[in-house]
């Protein structure tokens, strides 16, 4: 009777970095699939704001889900705006308008100013 294949140990939940180790299953090497997440960036921002504070893997999962959700909402709204204006390209203007439509009051103002600052920094570095 053949033994059931043993699953490989699960990767640590903290920071979901890319794993390049190969697993051996039935004598064949198989690479682990890469899990993309924003955990590295969330951690960097946390350390900028509160250097002495940590974050649990569950909280990191929630933050990752939140960033993905906001990204999809902004991208969807920007896509709709480009379509309404018969444009085939989403520019920073569509993103800015989408942010103004999606985020409430003061939060939208701060997001727009931070976004403008980031775009300026990026274009000046080119």
UniProtKB/Swiss-Prot annotation:
InterPro entries: Histone-fold (IPR009072), Histone_H2A/H2B/H3 (IPR007125), Histone_H2B (IPR000558), HISTONE_H2B_site (IPR055333). It holds the Pfam family Histone. The modification Dimethylated arginine is found at residue 80. It is found in: Nucleus; Chromosome. The modification N6-crotonyllysine is found at residues 6, 12-13, 16-17, 21, 24, 35. The modification N6-methylated lysine is found at residue 117. The keyword Phosphoprotein applies. The modification N6-(2-hydroxyisobutyryl)lysine is found at residues 6, 13, 21, 24, 35, 44, 47, 58, 86, 109, 117, 121. The modification PolyADP-ribosyl glutamic acid is found at residue 36. The modification N6-methyllysine is found at residues 47, 109. Belongs to the histone H2B family. This is Histone H2B type 1-K. It comes from Bos taurus. The lineage of its organism: Eukaryota, Metazoa, Chordata, Craniata, Vertebrata. The gene is H2BC12.
């Amino acid at each position: 009777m053949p033994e059931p294949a043993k699953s490989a140990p699960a990767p640590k939940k903290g920071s979901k970095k890319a794993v390049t180790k190969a697993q051996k299953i039935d004598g064949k090497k198989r690479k682990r699939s890469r899990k993309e997440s924003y955990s590295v960036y969330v951690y960097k921002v946390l350390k900028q704001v509160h250097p002495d504070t940590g974050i649990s893997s569950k909280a990191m999962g929630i933050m990752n889900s939140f960033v993905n959700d906001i990204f999809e909402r902004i991208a969807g709204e920007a896509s709709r705006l480009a379509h309404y204006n018969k444009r085939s390209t989403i520019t920073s203007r569509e993103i800015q308008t989408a942010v103004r439509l999606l985020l409430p009051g003061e939060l939208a103002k701060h997001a727009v100013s931070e976004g403008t600052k980031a775009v300026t920094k990026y274009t000046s570095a080119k």
